[in-house]
């Protein structure tokens, strides 16, 4: 039995996906992907599945997401899902389709929040006093 493990990251959220042969069940934190709320997050999560088409019907994918907020978790899960589908099938045409549609389905967004600097640490990383010339 073929098993594939993939990881997707976004900000502080980390999603780990495990893909194996099955009946096409996709679960996020043990919940079926269809009942994930709110709907706009569900729509973003369904993009790789819709683009892949019938290929997904023979794959069971379990995704576990930790850390971050709701949108960061959605992006991390989406990346892990896309990577799992491509790696399990080994289909380069599907990989090109994902990259052409949206690069973040396969490649994690490397941007992270900037650490706050000393002295004005509660106000943000680049906070300065406003300067008056007159």
Curated annotation (Swiss-Prot):
Q: Which SUPFAM superfamilies match?
A: Ribosomal protein S5 domain 2-like
InterPro entries in the record: Ribosomal_Su5_D2-typ_SF, Ribosomal_uS9, Ribosomal_uS9_archaeal, Ribosomal_uS9_CS, Ribsml_uS5_D2-typ_fold_subgr
Its BP terms in the Gene Ontology are: maturation of SSU-rRNA from tricistronic rRNA transcript (SSU-rRNA, 5.8S rRNA, LSU-rRNA); translation
Chain residue ranges for the region called Disordered? 109-134
Q: Where is the signal peptide?
A: none
Query: In what ranges is there compositional bias, type Basic residues?
Result: 118-134
**A GO molecular-function descriptor:** structural constituent of ribosome
Q: Which family does it belong to?
A: Belongs to the universal ribosomal protein uS9 family.
Q: What's the protein here called?
A: Small ribosomal subunit protein uS9
Task: Tell me what gene encodes this.
Answer: rps9
């Amino acid at each position: 039995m073929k098993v594939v493990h993939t990881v997707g990251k976004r900000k502080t959220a980390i999603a780990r996906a495990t893909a194996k042969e099955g009946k096409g069940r996709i679960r996020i934190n043990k919940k079926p992907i269809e009942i994930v709320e709110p709907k706009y997050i569900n729509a973003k999560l369904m993009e790789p599945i819709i683009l892949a088409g019938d290929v997904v019907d023979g794959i069971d994918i379990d995704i576990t997401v930790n850390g971050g907020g709701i949108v960061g978790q959605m992006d991390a899960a989406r990346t892990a899902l896309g990577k799992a589908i491509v790696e399990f099938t080994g289909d380069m045409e599907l990989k090109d389709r994902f990259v052409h549609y949206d690069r973040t389905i396969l490649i994690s967004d490397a941007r992270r929040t900037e650490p706050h600097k000393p002295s004005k640490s509660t106000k943000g990383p680049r906070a300065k006093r406003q300067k008056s010339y007159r």
